[in-house]
């Protein structure tokens, strides 16, 4: 099988981001958990939807430093991986991650986090700094370090804090540019400011400011907040005992996947929150505080001062981003949210400084930094222990300009850009009235990891607001000329919250400053795309990313209606809103700010007291449906009487419900609108707290009484600064407001189990106007110009009778202002249909909201009491369903069943004998080799066709089901933004790659089985052919001797047949009559030719005879001539001898020849040479010569044999053997005695005669039996004769042995036959038996031993004739 689908998925991710990076992720697509869970899901969209619900990609990253995080965020998007799989992997990785986080502690990670059902976390680094700003930040911002004691919560050494002005303040352009890439719904990675000291709280409780902090007349520039608050350090010791007691009572359900710092954990003790050094923070602060009658804190610019009390805030955010760009290489890890959050009974926002080691909080959110910013000054007159930190926007700091209200409209439009929902507030020409009392941290650039699975505890005892403080706070609000920008909630109620355990909502953002456990237990489900999480710089940046709303356009509230902005009205209102580039054309989020400038520059808010509310934190409105859902949820999640096993089961149920919330995409989500402020005094920061976060599928809270204002929000701040209003819209005094708030405080404790909210520090609530004040404001409610198709579809999909709830937050590095708009119960609230985007006049923040009302008109009142109760599970908007094929075309997924390819071209050269007819051999070979394969292929093709048919039927059924009921993935993909679609397409591409590789693996496995079958058949064929080859070789060995002759006969017959066929064809071409006449003439000619041929042959014979005769005569003439010449020579030589003398010598020689029997051949001085006269061996010529030497009578016998050309080879061989033996046997040396010589010559002559008879006998044998063989050795001559006995059908071999001694010594004829040995051997016979062999042997022996001449041939003939 090819490469794991995992490498293809990584390569796909690299293609998306434009880089090549081979880095493996532990939970990438293709892991064992993902594969198993993917197989279990029958719905194709199930599991995919979980991954795409809240993830987004930063499309504006440009630096190399962003690559790791972008690659991680895409590659770690897991489809359907369960929590236990991630937990197992987490345990193996987090130990190294903790060490890495400590080693890289000097890194400021401004990242944005988003949650999905499986609790994944994403980092979104920001890199939008110019070179000049980077250099300014790096050189002009020194570090600040704080030393603290972890045990006593008191600083050990001096703190070096440098507050200086930023040389170049950030403009709205820098804010918007820095946050273009931030599109997620949660942000928890940036610094959170902690409070300065408990001394401030004690001073405020006492009713007067600390003398060391607030001089009456002079401006104070605090360079070291730690020295400025010496007494505040001691106040922290009081809360140690309380903290330890609370921790003993709490059940800390820790996630064991990572080490947790129990003693000084960030989540366990809110006072452990620390700020970072100035090199890490985006803002450097210079504070000037003075006491004025209105107890008001103002933000002032170093160059422009509009009031004696000012706080200067210089933006070094781009410097911080420069540092992030170089440092931001941390890898993302999984977050396991399988444990509930333990909410403490008591909470105090006053933090203490910690050491560097204590500030490292090992929590299970993928190594994010919780960076804290310093607080430089506090004011008196407010109980800071009841102030709780707001959710903070950790993405950008605040650039404040206190002279915004004094500028002309033309000056404000120069720096206008689009709103950025993820950016911090850019506050100009306004004064912050509430400051967040957060203490700076002693850590510098240290990474903190927050674990949402840990309980939150606090050691500070609750401190409640009294009526004097509330009256003073209300008085300050009425006299303030600066806008309120913080959503603050009370930290604790008037009485302790019962200790109980809650199950956290993993899809819900976490409140950093430890809200009450019971309040968190009643939280509503959060919409995934509208989740708000604590943001940077301790600011509540409420980003509600709505999938069907426009994020880039803000809206305004006029009365109870929402109005879209226009360019001319925006310039007329002199608003400056930070730009925010829309990341997608589908995700449009409506947002607005809760401040608008009045023409005279005073921004005031009107608050209304609620007699039914006894707590300032009663800012969240609730509907009866919310009460019912809260009551059911409280009964479901309450753990006061449950055992530990029940708690675990409920935890798992919470995880499942959260995943359901993500998968179902509840579009009926409503967000609460909360406007609430804190009391502002000289040197005080405003603390921002998010009022409520909703999960998907939550039911909106209804208010007991509606908030009303007499004028729209455009003029709302001015009137609020003049006088707060009562429930009926009439102005009331500060005393009335204070009395109303005290009642609210008491009522909050009683209703804390019914209304689900996060407690914040508020003193009054803002009433929304029920009717717009003028027609111009009504006209601005229209949505025709700004609501896009996605927003309208989303608005139409919402259920009717839902109250508009908007949550507003603003962030600043070190001081925050939150203003909330509340809706009380049991009163109708007017909603405007189709509202998508409305701008506000003050560029303070961009708030995401949902305005969901389909049935009601633009200004139609919807009674709360008539609201229907909604189910816990949401319903999808009414959109036109699409088919599966259309969705697959949208995602680029295609099936391969309709592909057609051309036939493979022929790559071999054409054969010259293409039309040659196949022989039988070729046909048989093809049959035995290919036929089994063809059968197997036929079967395989049928199986494949069946599989394909089944697959098509299955796909058809799926198409019918999906068309009948579209999966949620179809809707989400069509409504997704371009960036989300890129991410989803990358996931689809990985799924396609995985499916393709898996299908290829299945195909190879199936094909392997097919090939095994083919191999088996081929092996069987090979075995059979090998057996046949062996048999054929055996047969060929037998037939081979006769094959050649048969082949020659066959070829001759073929030639004859062909010739006859040609003749027949030739004869058929002519007429038969003419042919007959021609044949007659031909016969006559043949006869004549034959006659003449005979005559010619006769003449030729005659000629030859005459030629022979002529030749003989010629030879005779030649001989005569030679003889004549010889005679003449002889005569010439012997002419001296007399004739008589010569005649006498001739007579003597003749007499000697007659006596000896030898002819004298020659006479020499040395001896004489004699030759025998026997010529009986005709046609052989064997002449025996004897040379007698004269000296010692040495006789050398030599036989000169001459054989004719046609002689028998066997006889010649016998004669040669006999002659050689005879010469050796008779060559002797005699003494000088002629008698002995004469006798010896006689014996030689007789012996030679015997040998002549023997040779003639050999010739007779050869004539009858040609296969005669003769062998000779030193003692005998062996003759082998093969006889075929026809009567007995057998063949015998007769062996004669003639002894040489007897042959050469016998002088009698035939005597040597008596000593001849005879043997008979049977060669083959039809029947077994030795009877005839013995008979043959006896017959041969008798004939040989009794015959004198020709005994051998006579004996063989006798036997042959006998058995013939």
Curated annotation (Swiss-Prot):
GO biological process: attachment of mitotic spindle microtubules to kinetochore; cell division; deactivation of mitotic spindle assembly checkpoint; homologous chromosome orientation in meiotic metaphase I; meiotic centromeric cohesion protection in anaphase I; mitotic sister chromatid biorientation; mitotic spindle assembly checkpoint signaling; positive regulation of meiosis I spindle assembly checkpoint
Residue(s) carrying Phosphothreonine: 257, 453, 507
Residues spanned by motif Nuclear localization signal: 1091-1105
Annotated GO CC locations: condensed chromosome, centromeric region; kinetochore; Knl1/Spc105 complex; nucleus; outer kinetochore
The organism's taxonomic lineage, starting at the top: Eukaryota, Fungi, Dikarya, Ascomycota, Taphrinomycotina
Principal subcellular localization: nucleus
Protein name from the UniProt record: Outer kinetochore KNL1 complex subunit spc7
Keyword Cell cycle assigned: yes
Keywords, comma-separated and alphabetical: Cell cycle, Cell division, Centromere, Chromosome, Coiled coil, Kinetochore, Meiosis, Mitosis, Nucleus, Phosphoprotein
Subcellular location: Nucleus; Chromosome, Centromere, Kinetochore
């Amino acid at each position: 099988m090819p490469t794991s689908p995992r490498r293809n998925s990584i390569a796909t991710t690299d293609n998306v981001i434009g880089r090549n990076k081979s880095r493996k992720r532990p939970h990438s697509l293709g892991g064992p958990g993902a594969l198993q869970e993917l197989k279990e899901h029958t719905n194709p969209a199930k599991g995919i939807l979980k991954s795409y619900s809240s993830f987004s990609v930063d499309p504006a990253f440009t630096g190399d430093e962003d690559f790791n995080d972008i690659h991680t965020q895409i590659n770690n998007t897991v489809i359907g991986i369960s929590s236990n799989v991630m937990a197992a992997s987490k345990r193996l990785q987090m130990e190294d991650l903790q060490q890495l986080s400590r080693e890289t502690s000097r890194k400021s990670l401004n990242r944005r986090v988003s949650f999905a059902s499986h609790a994944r976390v994403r980092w979104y680094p920001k890199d939008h700094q110019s070179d000049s700003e980077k250099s300014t930040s790096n050189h002009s911002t020194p570090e600040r370090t704080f030393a603290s004691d972890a045990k006593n919560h008191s600083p050990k050494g001096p703190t070096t804090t440098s507050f200086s002005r930023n040389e170049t303040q950030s403009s709205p352009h820098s804010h918007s540019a820095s946050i273009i890439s931030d599109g997620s719904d949660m942000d928890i990675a940036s610094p959170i400011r902690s409070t300065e000291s408990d001394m401030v709280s004690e001073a405020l409780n006492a009713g007067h400011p600390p003398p060391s902090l607030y001089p009456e007349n002079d401006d104070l520039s605090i360079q070291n907040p730690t020295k400025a608050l010496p007494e505040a350090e001691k106040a922290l010791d009081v809360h140690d005992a309380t903290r330890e007691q609370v921790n003993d009572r709490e059940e800390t359900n820790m996630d064991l996947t990572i080490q947790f710092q129990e003693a000084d954990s960030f989540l366990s003790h809110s006072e452990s929150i620390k700020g970072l050094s100035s090199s890490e923070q985006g803002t450097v602060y210079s504070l000037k505080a003075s006491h004025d009658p209105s107890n008001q804190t103002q933000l002032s610019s170093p160059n422009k001062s509009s009031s004696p009390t000012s706080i200067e805030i210089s933006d070094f955010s781009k410097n911080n981003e420069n540092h992030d760009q170089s440092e931001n290489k941390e890898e993302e890890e999984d977050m396991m949210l399988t444990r509930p959050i333990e909410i403490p009974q008591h909470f105090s926002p006053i933090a203490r400084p910690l050491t560097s080691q204590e500030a490292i909080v090992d929590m299970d959110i993928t190594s994010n930094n919780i960076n804290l910013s310093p607080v430089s000054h506090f004011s008196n007159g407010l109980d800071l222990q009841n102030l709780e930190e707001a959710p903070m926007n950790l993405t950008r700091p605040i650039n404040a300009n206190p002279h915004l209200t004094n500028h002309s409209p033309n000056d404000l439009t120069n720096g206008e850009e689009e709103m950025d929902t993820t950016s911090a507030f850019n506050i100009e020409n306004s004064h912050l009235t509430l400051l967040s009392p957060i203490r700076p941290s002693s850590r510098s650039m240290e990474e903190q990891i927050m674990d949402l699975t840990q309980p939150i505890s606090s050691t500070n005892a609750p401190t409640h607001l009294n009526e004097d403080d509330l009256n003073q706070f209300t008085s300050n609000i009425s006299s303030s000329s600066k806008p309120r920008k913080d959503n603050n909630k009370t930290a604790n109620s008037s009485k302790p919250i019962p200790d109980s355990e809650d199950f956290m909502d993993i899809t819900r953002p976490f409140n950093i400053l430890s809200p009450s456990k019971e309040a968190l237990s009643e939280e509503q489900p959060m919409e995934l795309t509208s989740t708000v999480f604590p943001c940077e710089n301790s600011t509540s940046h409420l980003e509600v990313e709505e999938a069907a709303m426009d994020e880039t356009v803000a809206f305004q509230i006029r009365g109870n209606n929402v109005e879209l902005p226009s360019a001319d009205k925006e310039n007329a209102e002199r608003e400056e809103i930070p730009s925010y580039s829309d990341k997608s054309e589908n995700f449009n989020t409506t947002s607005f700010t809760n401040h608008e400038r009045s023409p005279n520059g005073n921004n005031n808010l009107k608050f209304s007291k609620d007699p039914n509310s006894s707590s300032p934190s009663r800012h969240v409105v609730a509907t009866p449906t919310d009460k019912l859902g809260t009551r059911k949820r409280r009964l479901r999640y309450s753990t006061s009487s449950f055992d530990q096993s029940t708690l675990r089961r409920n935890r798992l149920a919470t995880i499942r419900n959260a995943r359901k919330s993500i998968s179902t995409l509840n579009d009926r989500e409503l967000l609460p609108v909360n406007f609430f402020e804190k009391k502002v005094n000289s040197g005080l920061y405003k603390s921002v707290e998010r009022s409520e976060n909703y999960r998907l599928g939550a039911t909106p809270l209804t208010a007991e009484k509606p908030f009303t204002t007499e004028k729209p929000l455009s003029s709302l701040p001015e009137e609020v600064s003049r006088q707060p209003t009562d429930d009926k819209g009439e102005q009331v005094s500060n005393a009335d407001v204070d009395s109303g708030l005290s009642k609210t405080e008491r009522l909050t404790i009683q209703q804390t189990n019914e209304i689900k909210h996060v407690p914040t520090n508020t003193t009054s609530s803002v009433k929304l106007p029920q009717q717009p004040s003028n027609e111009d404001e009504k006209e601005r409610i229209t949505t025709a110009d700004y609501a896009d198709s996605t927003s309208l579809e989303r608005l139409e999909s919402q259920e009717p009778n839902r109250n508009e709830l908007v949550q507003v937050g603003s962030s600043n590095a070190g001081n925050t202002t939150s203003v909330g708009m509340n809706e009380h119960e049991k009163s109708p609230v007017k909603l405007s249909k189709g509202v998508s985007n409305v701008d506000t006049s003050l560029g303070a923040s961009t708030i995401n909201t949902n305005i969901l009302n389909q049935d009601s008109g633009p200004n139609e009142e919807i009674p709360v009491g008539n609201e229907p109760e909604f189910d816990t599970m949401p319903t999808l908007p009414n959109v036109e369903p699409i088919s599966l094929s259309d969705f697959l075309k949208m995602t680029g997924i295609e099936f391969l069943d309709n592909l057609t390819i051309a036939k493979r071209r022929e790559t071999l050269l054409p054969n010259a004998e293409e039309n040659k007819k196949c022989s039988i051999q070729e046909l048989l070979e093809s049959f035995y080799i290919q036929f089994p394969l063809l059968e197997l292929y036929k079967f395989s093709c049928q199986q494949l066709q069946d599989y394909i048919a089944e697959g098509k039927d299955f796909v058809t059924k799926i198409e019918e089901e999906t068309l009948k009921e579209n999966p949620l993935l179809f809707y989400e993909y069509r409504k997704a933004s371009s960036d989300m679609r890129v991410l989803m397409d990358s996931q689809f591409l990985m799924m396609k790659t995985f499916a393709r590789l898996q299908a290829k693996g299945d195909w190879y496995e199936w094909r392997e089985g097919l090939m095994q079958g083919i191999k088996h058949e081929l092996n069987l064929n090979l075995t059979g052919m090998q057996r046949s080859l062996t048999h054929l070789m055996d047969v060929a060995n037998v037939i081979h001797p006769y094959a050649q002759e048969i082949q020659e006969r066959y070829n001759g017959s073929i030639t004859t047949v062909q010739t006859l066929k040609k003749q027949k064809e030739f004869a058929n071409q002519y007429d038969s009559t003419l042919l007959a006449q021609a044949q007659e003439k031909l016969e006559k000619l043949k006869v004549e030719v034959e006659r003449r041929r005979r005559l010619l042959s006769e003449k030729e014979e005659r000629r030859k005879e005459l030629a022979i005769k002529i030749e003989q005569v010629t030879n005779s003439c030649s001989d005569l001539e030679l003889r004549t010449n010889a005679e003449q020579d002889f005569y010439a030589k012997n002419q001296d001898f007399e004739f008589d003398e010569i005649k006498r010598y001739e007579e003597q020689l003749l007499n000697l020849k007659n006596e000896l029997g030898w002819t004298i051949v020659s006479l020499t001085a040395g001896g004489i040479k004699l030759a025998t006269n026997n010529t009986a061996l005709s046609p052989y010529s064997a002449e025996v010569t004897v040379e007698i030497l004269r000296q010692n009578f040495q006789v050398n016998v030599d036989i000169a044999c001459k054989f004719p050309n046609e002689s028998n080879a066997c006889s010649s061989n016998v004669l040669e053997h006999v002659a050689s033996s005879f010469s050796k046997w008779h060559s002797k040396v005699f003494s000088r005695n002629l008698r002995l010589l004469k006798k010896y010559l006689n014996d030689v002559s007789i012996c030679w005669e015997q040998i002549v008879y023997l040779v003639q006998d050999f010739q007779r044998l050869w004539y009858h039996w040609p296969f005669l063989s003769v062998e000779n050795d030193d003692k005998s001559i062996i003759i082998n004769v093969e006889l075929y006995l026809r009567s007995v059908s057998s063949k015998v071999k007769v062996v004669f042995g003639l002894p040489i001694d007897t042959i050469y010594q016998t002088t009698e004829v035939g005597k040597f036959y008596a000593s001849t040995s005879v043997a008979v051997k049977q060669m083959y016979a039809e029947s077994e038996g030795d009877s005839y062999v013995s008979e043959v042997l006896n017959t041969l022996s008798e004939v040989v031993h009794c015959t004198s001449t020709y005994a051998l041939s006579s004996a063989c003939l006798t036997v042959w004739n006998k058995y013939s």
